[in-house]
Regions:
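Structured alpha/beta or helical-core interaction and ligand-binding surfaces enriched in interleaved
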Residues: 1-200
Length: 200
């Protein structure tokens, strides 16, 4: 879902408006207009957060209605296990040798091709066709972590809907099957992924 602020406000025009305000010699008027613009942007942002949260909850409810359950679990053991299955497959030397590689996001292992993941539509198909045992969902910048019950009902389209309606901190989604040793990742960057990788 595109941010509401981008739909109702052209940022280039906003910057021009801010430049015009800066040229006003009357300090009191300049400050009043600046404050009003800040309040407008804040309200639009609040509205955007509200709309995204509602849309995300609707998608989650649709999954629940189909029998898919997201059961909260403790994050750290899942992250540690994921790292032990995937991150440890790439040496620190290989990571350092990769130009511009950053460990800021776990999915960089795949976007920098340090691990040979299937990408795009092939990754979606691989996810849909994979045997789903015990499946977990976690994020790079959120503490929420879930065990996905009845994961065999979950599709790549469901994940696209979750991602499209997620807030920024939930926008890097990692699905992880520790029994079958595969991961499916939907990054926040629209032009990256999704990625599917199975450890041998």
């Amino acid at each position: 879902m595109e941010s509401i602020i981008f739909r109702i406000m052209n940022l280039k025009e906003l910057h021009q408006l801010e430049e015009e305000i800066e040229k006003i010699s009357d300090t009191q008027e300049r400050e009043a207009r600046t404050k009003l613009i800040e309040q407008i942007v804040e309200k639009i942002t609040d509205y955007d957060v509200h709309v995204r949260k509602y849309a995300y909850q609707q998608v989650v409810q649709a999954l629940i209605d189909r029998g898919i359950i997201l059961e909260p679990v403790i994050r750290e053991p899942i992250i540690t296990e994921w790292d032990n299955h995937f991150d440890c497959l790439v040496s620190d030397e290989a990571k350092q040798a990769a130009k511009y590689y950053s460990n800021q996001f776990r999915w960089h292992l795949f976007s920098f091709e340090l691990l040979p993941a299937i990408q795009g539509d092939q990754a979606r198909a691989a996810f849909n066709e994979s045997k789903k045992g015990e499946l977990y969902l976690f994020f790079d910048y959120a503490d929420e972590t879930y065990r996905v019950k009845n994961a065999h009902l979950l599709t790549a389209d469901d994940i696209e809907a979750l991602r499209e309606n997620s807030s920024l901190n939930l926008s890097d989604m990692y699905f992880y099957d520790p029994l079958n040793k595969w991961t499916y990742i939907k990054p926040h960057e629209e032009y990256c992924g999704p990625y599917f990788f199975k450890a041998e």
